[in-house]
Amino acid sequence: DINFKIEEGEYVSIIGPSGCGKSTLLSIIAGLENKTSGTTYINGKIGYMLQKDNLLEWRTVLNNVFLGLEIQKSNTPENKKYVIELLKKYGLYEFKDKYPNQLSGGMRQRVALIRTLAIKPKILLLDEAFSALDYQTRLMVTEDIYKILKNEGITALMVTHDISEGRFQSRQYV
């Protein structure tokens, strides 16, 4: 059994060993898996960022960021403008015509984050989103992403097996 509440704008980590159900919990929260009992209350649109960046190698940074909007059929001029603003605001605009294989691991994760933010989620689920990065890059990227989420006013729930990573960013851990 698990019970917790996350207030708007908070960054919360669920920390535990591999196989304990952290990713399953995120899948239940996202509505991708059914729960066996209990209740889940979500107030807002959810974005989901996985361990692997899942950037499409044949698409430019800009076209990768537009992907979620295309899938949701919301690739409007207003949303395209918002994406361009995000890319500029977070230092990725100059790389908009590059392909994923031309980016560092940290930059790829930032592109994946901007792609997730493009759909304007109120809640972001991070499933071991930085574990594929080396320690130094992970520290830098998690700090960058934490600042971006705070700046955008997004509530985040991160799962990790790394205690130091979870405690570094979060005010609350489960």
Regions found by a protein language model. Give the residues of each.
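Conserved signature/switch motifs of ABC ATPase nucleotide-binding domains
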Residues: 98-101, 119
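Hydrophobic anchor residue at the start of the ABC signature
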Residues: 113
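Conserved H-loop
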Residues: 153-159
